[in-house]
Structures are given as structure tokens and as C-alpha cells.
């Protein structure tokens, strides 16, 4: 049946494919209007989604030698067969899954044979029948009624075949052979799970023989934006005798209508302009005698001028995210509801832009981004990252092997064409990207030129120019921006933004790698974006964690990542790197991005005079939002008032005197909350868009002491222990060997029964991946405290136990050395004071502080510090200072791969309680704290969230500080300013047991 094989021939990308065209589904005259929610509700479309008979073969040879093509098992289309028990589930980042031997692929090439029946009720020779596949990975052959129809590859491209001469009235049979690997595999080495199958819609279009095949829509604006032109051109037609164009405005009113020409220019006066802030759409109808093509049109103009990115004459910033097609239960298959949920979260998170990493999405997605309002960088299905792994790790000298090899020219240009031609009429697409991580060379030069020839109204992006051979001259004139991924803020400013010779805008196509507890350096990037006009923004890596849901445990999904499926090659949990979980529950990092992208922000403040800036591009602030001011006084009381806005134009700042609107007497702080004025499709009225806080004076806690300052203190000793009794109700036992507080007895109840610990270890975050081995080698993980000597000092108010200590581990010198002093006061308060020096030859510390182990019943938590999310030196812009309440169980977020989470810095008060007894921590200086039911050992060694088991203890950590989070899982090293790298540590706080 397979007479010719094309999947190992770089010159053959497809066989019998119809010329690529703009995407549309033609309706018949008299049918209801086309809308993406009901896109197949036309007699012109026969949807072939559903159950197909399916047979899996481990190799093409097995398929060819198997005469009995069984029709017993079925597989849903669209789907990926890997999630239905066939083949291997595999996650890879950069490595090729097959030997690098282009154009050849392994003989053991898994394949799936699909077949089903379909019916044509009224076959009419006056019509043509076109078979469409919107996405098949990676290559496929197709037959109708046992006749070969054609072949195609490019997984994320639309393939359309003319089957008019092969179908008949009544029942027909379709067969599709899908190959896992083809020569296209060398161009599809994206960072993702490697699935296979028919993963997007399949349908047949009934086409009138007199028809429009392809058309192009472009919009242009006058300089004053008071007039627009919509240019419509029929680029290819079939037997076309006449055509009518009709244009309707967003209210459904006809603007104009014209007949009889193949192109037309609509003049629109006082146009409604499309942007992410106001995604209004006109409707264009292209009518022939038997068909109606509907195209939504957003009137907008894209330009690059003065190293800036302009939409409708306004310089805008890209506040974007990279967005793979990934779902924990369906893999590559993304439905309308999946897209809508993601776009809803993006809108709620103040994102305005999406990069379709790293391939075009289905047309449905672009129809939705047109309607809901996003700036889209649409990317070609090209990635050859595996070439840097051919001769060792990250050998970038080999990055250009494919990009500069003429054998791949046809394939690369074909992929660029396939990414532009079907999608050219979507208004939300504001730039094209030639691909991802594929180096640079003559093929990319030609690809960029081809892209410009297809569409010169949108800028072209490609990051790979960075890796070009600097000894050769390449034409970069068709690449319209300078793009980088994961440079440090310092490198960006020094190399690009402060360079007077910069001749193109600068963009980050990937940054702030959001893996695990992250990102920790977002604010530094955003500061530069706002500071420099030429820094037009970026796309966070990435939107969602990639993981496979394999079941449920205790009502929570079980997620699995690379290496969990017995793969020979894999890249572990590197796929778990999004700002939302696989099931779209937002990570804390999501709220960091939301806050950084807030539409109104505080840019300066002097006493009660503040300066706010409207970050919106087109809407006056007062029409979009209002400001709610929450004032907290020094006693903890709160009042709420509204601060009026007026004539607050986009990209302008206004000075407001808070004292005109709030009570400033005895003020502690004020939080300015920016709230939406009205309901929109994804957000409700009063939805909080972001906030700013001004702290004038922190509140202090007035401690209530159970003991009198005159209470007697009694000290007794054994060989190992020092016992300090305060009156008859409190007893503290200290260990002479390690300077720990070994137990606390309060009113004959044991509060602490395990030694406190001096901690410098944290369960490594994903961003600690490049430093954690240095930490472990230096003995940080299992560090212990060694007491050299001690002394007991008594005075009228307290007894002080002064321990001279060193923090040590086998085979390494002491990391820290100095004194820890326990001051036992007559009122029952313990004061803990550290005065330590650090070995500066050792790596910077993960953390430093005291750990307490309490009974599990200590569950309720109150604190005065930064919340409600985790906060670290460089992560926590979504937080604010306030009184917060939570539980130990709910503190922080447990990541798919467990790691450090749940710390709260800038704290001065913590209370943890079992409902009766309390442990209270206070300090005049801020500290960090964390509390959990999982030990550091368990969090460090457990590889999956569902394997964690809550322990019968509550762990409370009081930290001088932790090192920052950063984004070094893929980005720059942690900024030195956020490393716990002190030579000297002085730390003091109070412990009280009530």
C-alpha cells in the first residue's frame, strides 16, 4: 500500500498538497454567521473528529508486513497515542530522540494506522471536496477508498488535499498512516513531551467550484488615527466570476459593500481601533454565488520606529508569556475550553502578549486572541537545538549545522511559509518568529526574506542571530529586533540598552525561567523595561508546567515528568517550569507577574505626596479602574476610602496628595489597590489589578507576660544538660554539646521535645540546581553545631547561657563560628542572639537561622510580615506588609518536585498555636520564618509531590535571612546582592511559650 516513501527525503515536504491559503471555513449563503464557537455548523463541513479504528506498530516494517489491519480497537481523534498506552512517553529538552543522521530515521519507527468510515449524503460533481488536517505529528500518508491521496509533514501546519476524484456518494473509507519520526524530526526538537498522532481537527470542506481560494486583509491608519483603510485582495481564486465584499462595524452596522472586483479598499472614518485593551472587531464578508467567507478584522497598525514597538501610533511594551500546547490529560490536544481558561488567566494576570512557543497554534487560538485581545508573536515550527549536544554539553559552535546547510533550505523555507500563509489575516498577530534555538545561517537569511515577501506589515523576530558566524557577513535587514533569552539585567543594560549604536528594539523572547519556586529576579528586568524605551518587553518562560496526570491521590492530581516513564533519554523535571500548574492552578510566581504588570503603579513618594503612572497604552486610567486606599493605623485598625482619578491619560504620571483623602493620624501604612471599574469577559467589577503599599511606621507588638520580672530563676546542670527553671511554671533544658534548646516544659506540658537546630540548609529549589552541589560538597546539608566552651552569666533580670560554637561537617572547615547566647529572662521570655563569623572561602549560604520542632497540633499561624505569598529577598512584589493568618498545612505551595517554599521575610511577629498553647517569636529587626509539616530531609530527598507524607511534627524555622530565588535553573546566576554572603552575622529575636 505504501508504494513510495517520502519521510526520509528533505526535498519532499508534501505530496499532492493544495497550495497554502488563509484559513477560513466557508459557509453557505443563508446560514448563520460563522463564529469560532460553532465553526463547523455549516453544510460545507464534515467533521471527522471522534472515534477512529487504530492499530499501533512498533516499526514501519511491522506495518508493511502486517496484512491484517485489524479494526477492533479505537482511538479518539484528536489525541496523542502515547497517552493511551501506546509507545513511549518521553520528555526531552535539547537532545534529539533519535541518532543524528539526517535525513534518515530509525528503522524501528513507531507508527499508527488510523481508519474510519464517513458519509457524503449528496455527492455533487459541481463541488470540490478538500480534506484538512490541522495537526499531525510528525508525518503521515493518507488514502481514500484505497487510493493514495498524499503525504505531508510539519506537525503544526495545516495540510489540505483535494479528494474530489476519490470520494463518492454514501459511505467512504479514509486511512491515515502516522509516523513518529521523519526527516522533519530534525527540525522539531522543541523542549516538550514528544507525543505522536493526529492531535488537531480533521474535516472535509465542500467547496463550490466558483470560489475564492486565498485572500489577504491589511489595515492602515492615517497619521491622526481618524481614518483607516482596510485593503482586501483576492490572491487566488477558482473559476471566479464575481465577488462581493461587505464590511460591518463592531455594532453590526454596515460600513460599505462593493461587488465585481478582486480587490477593494474600504475607507473607514473615525475607526474603532483594535488593541489588547479594546479588542473591537469589524466583520468582513466575502460572498460568491454559493459561499460566504467571514473574516474578523481588527483595525490596527504595527510599526517599529526609533527602536520602539508601536501599535496604532503608541509605543507599547510586551508583557508576555511563552505558551506551549500542553495539557496534563490530553497532551498536545487543546480545546476551545482549554484555550479560554488560559486566556482568562492571562488577562487576569495582566498579560498582554503571547509567543506561540515554538510552533503555530491552531486557527481557533488566533480567532480567540483576536476577540479577547492579545498581541501574538506567532512562531514557525522550527527548532534544531539538539545540534549543540552532538559533541558534548551545550556546544554552541555547532548551533548553525542545520541553519547553514543547504540540504535543509527547502524544509526551513517551507516551514516559514506554512507558519505565515494560513494565519496572515489574524489581527492579533503582530510579529512573526522564524523559529526557536536553531542557530543561524544562509537558510535563515533566505527564510527571513521569504517571510518579508509574504508579509511586510509585521516585524520579524529571530533570536538565533546571536549564534551566527561573526567571520561571515549575513543579511540581517529582515530581522527587525534584537532578541535574547536569559541574559542578566546587568548584561542587558551594559551590552544593549546603554549602547549608542543600538539600531533595533531589544526584546527578551524568554526570561525569568519560572521553574519551581520562582521567579526571583523579575523586578530587575521590569525596572529596565520601564526605564528604557528601546527595551520593548519580553515573554516569561513559560505559561504552564508540562506534566502528565497519571491519577489522583487524596483529591489531588498526580503529575509525572521526564524519567518517570522509563525513557532511555530524558531531561527530568526541566519541563515543570511554568507559572501555572499543569491543571492551571496559578503558582505564586503568576502573581509576581501580575503585580509587575499592573496598569497603575507608584513611581515615587515623598511623605504623603505620591506620583502614580498610568501604564495603559490607550485608555485613561479613570475609565478603566479606580483606586481603593486601605489605611492601617498603629493600633491595627483599618479604614477604606476611594481616591478619585481624572483626566489621567495613558503613559502619563499624576501627583496625588494622600492627605486629601485619608486619615493620616497615627498611620502605619496605606495600601493602594487598583480595581477594575466594570465587568469584562474574564474579570468582574472590582477585580484587583494590582497594588502598591507605603509603610510609614511598622506596628509593634505589646507583649503580655505571664511571669513577673521578679520571678526566681533556678539553674541546675548535668554532664550534658543545663536546666533553667523560671518560677514553677517554665523549664528550659539546653544541650551543652550543641547549644540547642532541647526541651520546653510549660505548666507541666511539653512544648518542645526535640533539639532546636542551627540551620544553613534549605531544600534546594530548581533555581538552586547549579549551586546545590557546591553547598552539599561544603557540608551544608548535614551541618552540625559543636560547642567549644560555654559560660553561664546571671544578673538581676536574666540568666545568659553563652556558647562558643562552630558549625561543622566532616572533611571541611567550620562554615560559621562565634557565639550563640540564650538569654532566659525572669518574665519567661527567651532571647536568642547570634554573633558569628563565616568562612568566606565557602559558597554563599542558602539560609541561616534556628529550627524548632513542635507537636503536629501546632497548626494555626499568625504573623506580621510579608504575605500572603512566599517572600524572599528577590521574590515577593505580589506581597504586602500586614497581619496574616494561615495554617501550617497551607503555608507556601508544594511544587511537583518538592523544594523550599513558604518563607515570609520582613516579619517581626509570628505566633504558632495548637488552639491552647502558643509559641511566639518577635524581634525589633525583621526576620524570615517558615513552617511546614515536612522535614528538610524529606523535602530535599522526595522527588514528587504526591510522595510527600506529612510528619507528626510541625517544623518552625526562624531565619536571619535566606538567599534569594533567582532564575538560575536556566537563567543567570543569582545576583550577588541577593546572596547570603555576609562575613558577619548578628541576629537576635525573642521566643515566648504561652
UniProtKB/Swiss-Prot annotation:
GO terms for cellular component: beta-galactosidase complex. InterPro entries: B-gal_small/dom_5 (IPR004199), Bact_Beta-galactosidase (IPR050347), Beta-gal/glucu_dom_sf (IPR036156), Gal_mutarotase_sf_dom (IPR011013), Galactose-bd-like_sf (IPR008979), GH-type_carb-bd (IPR014718), Glyco_hydro_2 (IPR006101), Glyco_hydro_2_AS (IPR023232). Keywords: Glycosidase, Hydrolase. The keyword Hydrolase applies. SMART domains: Bgal_small_N. Its EC number is 3.2.1.23. Gene3D superfamilies: 2.70.98.10, Galactose-binding domain-like, Glycosidases, Immunoglobulins. It is an enzyme of class 3 (hydrolase). Coiled coil: none annotated. Belongs to the glycosyl hydrolase 2 family. This is Beta-galactosidase. It comes from Staphylococcus xylosus.
